[in-house]
Amino acid sequence: MSAGWVAGAVRAKALVGRYPGAAGAREVAACDRLGDALRCLAATPYSRYARTAVGLPEAQRAVTATLLWHLRVLAGWLPRGGARLLVPLAAGFEIANVASRLPAPGGRRAESPQPYRLGALETAWRSLEHAATPGELRAALVASPWGDPGGDTPWALVTGMRMAAARRTAVAVPPARRWAQGRAVLLTAREQFVHQRSLLEPAQRHAARLLGGRASAAASYQEFR
């Protein structure tokens, strides 16, 4: 192992060691009031952003922004080219950026937070952020490593990106394959058995590669299980 990878491994262990872990997460979840939860976070690395949170959306954003910041820090410690392993793991932040630009249910556009700053962990955000319509977003995705989501409706764009991210994670980071498969299971089940709509072809293809053809083509929840 090169010195660069050793430095990255040491940094990763240091970051993990500072986090509250499962016990801390349960403690925060058990808080009756947001103020109590924020006080719990104040003693953790999440305080970097949580100290200015005044409501639940801001607190949630503080937690995710801290995670992204530490992924970017870790990427900076890895040797040249090593950050590519973290790009699929940061895909959710790019998806959130895209989702915030899409019309909310009913056609209205909700107030959007500032986009996450991805730095070296972006997949294609610098192209996607200039898209003014769902059709332009789809075209930008087609021309990027994300690939075609199969449609330009908000649900098609976001679901297509999420399934593509699961597939990319499984390929680029083999130890995370089970996480990626779990994500694909939840996405497939939600679309087919909650919303009663079939996955579009690109997402269906990714799901089949992750879960097998029988699961992705199941006609009932019992068969899917």
Residue ranges and their predicted role:
Residues 1-225:
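N-terminal domain-start signal
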